[in-house]
Amino acid sequence: MDLPGPIHDILLVFLGSGLILGGLGVVLFTNPIFSAFSLGLVLVCISLFHILSNSYFVAAAQLLIYVGAVNVLIIFAVMFMNGSEYYNDFYLWTVGDGVTSLVCTSILFSLITTISDTSWYGIIWTTGSNQIIEQDLISNVQQIGIHLSTDFYLPFELISIILLVALIGAIAMARQ
């Protein structure tokens, strides 16, 4: 989206704060319904980030697939479950929880140091979608495939990982 600089920056700050607050809400709310709605806020903010970066198809796919399907499925699953069994064991802290917290915290700090130490301006994409093939000679589906495999490769892979985690979580909840 071609916006003037200050408006674009204000929208980035607003969406970033919504993303951080939604992520904190997913983790910190004890009520699973509120956590699911916070996840919906996070997914909507991510799709709005895609709109700001001019990738409208990825934004539409994010809204339709994740907000429209996965988050609604999570909300229905949480609403049909018996909530009392989760509140009884809420304050128990096991060794596995401590090890998991330690591993996740170390991964977080290593990611923060890697991101801050990397020179992002030196990264050059080797292949652009306009260098592969003439755009007039291919269909829309082929253009989407080319864009997903070149320009939007990283967001596409991250969305795939989020979907995989959602499926594993749904299977784990169904087995209990």
Swiss-Prot record:
Stored Pfam families: Oxidored_q3
First-listed, main subcellular location of the protein, grouped into a coarse class: plastid
UniProt key word Calcium: no
Membrane-spanning intervals of the chain: 10-30, 32-52, 61-81, 92-112, 152-172
Membrane topology: Multi-pass membrane protein
Location of this chain's protein in the cell: Plastid, Chloroplast thylakoid membrane
Reactions mediated catalytically: a plastoquinone + NADH + (n+1) H(+)(in) = a plastoquinol + NAD(+) + n H(+)(out); a plastoquinone + NADPH + (n+1) H(+)(in) = a plastoquinol + NADP(+) + n H(+)(out)
Record InterPro entries: NAD(P)H-Q_Oxidoreduct_6, NADH_UbQ/plastoQ_OxRdtase_su6, Nuo/plastoQ_OxRdtase_6_NuoJ
Any GO molecular function: NADH dehydrogenase (ubiquinone) activity
EC class of the enzyme, as a word: translocase
Paired cysteines (S-S): none
EC numbers: 7.1.1.-
Keyword field: Chloroplast, Membrane, NAD, NADP, Plastid, Plastoquinone, Quinone, Thylakoid, Translocase, Transmembrane, Transmembrane helix, Transport
Annotated Gene Ontology cellular component terms: chloroplast thylakoid membrane
Family stated for the protein in its record: Belongs to the complex I subunit 6 family.
Stated role: NDH shuttles electrons from NAD(P)H:plastoquinone, via FMN and iron-sulfur (Fe-S) centers, to quinones in the photosynthetic chain and possibly in a chloroplast respiratory chain. The immediate electron acceptor for the enzyme in this species is believed to be plastoquinone. Couples the redox reaction to proton translocation, and thus conserves the redox energy in a proton gradient.
Quaternary structure note: NDH is composed of at least 16 different subunits, 5 of which are encoded in the nucleus.
Protein name: NAD(P)H-quinone oxidoreductase subunit 6, chloroplastic
Organism whose genome encodes this protein: Drimys granadensis
Organism phylogeny: Eukaryota, Viridiplantae, Streptophyta, Embryophyta, Tracheophyta
